[in-house]
C-alpha cells in the first residue's frame, strides 16, 4: 500500500476510533455514518444494519470490532478489487 494512501487511511481510522482505544466499534461507526449525506435519510435501524455489515466484512478475528490492522487490510483489499 502506498505511503500516502496508508497515511490517509490511518487518519480516517483515528477519526472513526472516537475513544482512542485502537478499535472501531459498531456504535462509533454508526455515529460517524449518520454524519454522511448517504446515510442521513436512513432510519436508525438501517444505519445499525449497515454498520453491522461493515464490521462483519472487516472483522477478521470476529471480536465484534475493527482494529487498525483490520481496517487497513479491508481497505487495501477493496482498493485492489476496484483497480
Swiss-Prot record:
Q: Which InterPro entries match?
A: EF-hand-dom_pair, EF_Hand_1_Ca_BS, EF_hand_dom
Residues that hold Ca(2+) 2 according to the record? 59, 61, 63, 65, 70
Tissues expressing this chain: Selectively expressed in a small group of neurons.
Domain of life, source organism: Eukaryota
Detail which positions bind Ca(2+) 1: 17, 19, 21, 23, 28
What keywords tag this UniProt record? Calcium, Cytoplasm, Metal-binding, Repeat
Is Cytoplasm one of the keywords? yes
Protein location: Cytoplasm
User: Gene3D superfamilies attached here?
Assistant: EF-hand
Q: What is its main location?
A: cytoplasm
Q: What is this protein called?
A: Calsensin
What are the annotated GO cellular component locations?
Answer: cytoplasm
Q: Tell me if Metal-binding is a UniProt keyword of this record.
A: yes
* Organism, scientific name: Haemopis marmorata (Green horse leech)
Gene Ontology MF terms: calcium ion binding
The task this protein performs is described as:
May function as a trigger protein which interacts with a larger protein. May mediate calcium-dependent signal transduction events in the growth cones and axons of a small group of sensory neurons which fasciculate in a single axon tract.
Start and end residues of each EF-hand domain: 4-39, 46-81
Amino acid at each position: 500500500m502506498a505511503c500516502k494512501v496508508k497515511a490517509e487511511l490511518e487518519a480516517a481510522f483515528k477519526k472513526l476510533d472516537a475513544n482512542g482505544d485502537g478499535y472501531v466499534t459498531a456504535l462509533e461507526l454508526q455515529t460517524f455514518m449518520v454524519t454522511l449525506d448517504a446515510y442521513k435519510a436512513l432510519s436508525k435501524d438501517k444505519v445499525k444494519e449497515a454498520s453491522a455489515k461493515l464490521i462483519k466484512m472487516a472483522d477478521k478475528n470476529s471480536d465484534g470490532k475493527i482494529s487498525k490492522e483490520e481496517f487497513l487490510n479491508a481497505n487495501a483489499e477493496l482498493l485492489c478489487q476496484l483497480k
